[in-house]
Amino acid sequence: MMSAFMEKLSLPFRAVRWACILVRQGKTRLLLADSWTRLYKAWMEGLYALTYRLGGRLVGPPNVTIRLQTGHPVAYESPDHLIPFGTSQNNSTNKKFVMSMRARLQRDFPAQTFGTLDLGCSGGQLVRDFLDLGYVAVGLEGSDYSLKARRANWPALAGKHLFTCDIAHPFQIHIDERPAQFHLITMWEVLEHIETARLGQLFDNIVKHLAPGGYFVASTTSEPDVHEGVDLHQTKWTNAEWRAHLAKSHPQLVWTDLGLAYYQMVRHNEERSFLTYRRTS
């Protein structure tokens, strides 16, 4: 497992290799979109630093105790655990998304302490960003790779705000020993990794942990993702197929428009497919 220093050192080489692969595959549109997204994110990082860090608006984590109850602490059967590709590399965030959702939650839930849950959190940076704003932020990751490698935010947040868990099995998060409900639940490049037969339980977990009026935001893709001869994507549905499935299986989730472009989301793919929902009562 790579040290944090070696992981950072390898980033430029991985980026060049990935760019060459996209060019060979004729996916220059995706390469250009990703390059623009990276520039935009860097600009937002600067704006965020001026507005929040230098402005003294980062209050830090609230004083709460978070406990995860699960009979499946690791997704041992998942290809992502057996071949830890994305979970060993990703630590994504987008300060525009963070600032936009902060404004939206303040409007919709005034005078409340906000809660956010990132499912498939990888390195946990999105959790870290919401913690800095004073939110009750939690991240669940199916693989224990980042925990064991002590990468990204896991050394500081493991067992307190970051936990390993197979999210396709029943679980319950407790905050100060009370069942938790969150105002925002996110999944970035995760849904397609879930076995189709387990989607029902997954969305039962999501609805149970989503406060009435709360938001569910996810990215999806219908493309394969093959590593070491194994396709890590187990449910390759189009955006329309996901929406049809949710309309039938979990009608309490209602489609909503966040008014965000693809480069303002935390992660995106060539399809620019996103699921943006609110929970009814």
Predicted feature residues:
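Conserved N-terminal segment of class I S-adenosyl-L-methionine
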Residues: 5-180, 184, 197-203, 235-241, ...
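A short beta-strand submotif of the Rossmann-like class I SAM-dependent methyltransferase core
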Residues: 184-190
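Histidine-centered beta-alpha loop that forms part of the nucleotide-sugar donor binding/catalytic region
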Residues: 189, 221-223
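A short His-aromatic
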Residues: 193-194
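A short glycine-rich, Lys/Arg-flanked "PGG" loop and its adjoining helix->strand segment in the class I
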Residues: 200-212
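Conserved beta-strand signature within the Rossmann-like core of class I S-adenosyl-L-methionine
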Residues: 213-221
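A short acidic, helix-capping loop that chelates divalent metal ions and anchors anionic groups
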Residues: 225-230
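Conserved S-adenosyl-L-methionine
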Residues: 252-264
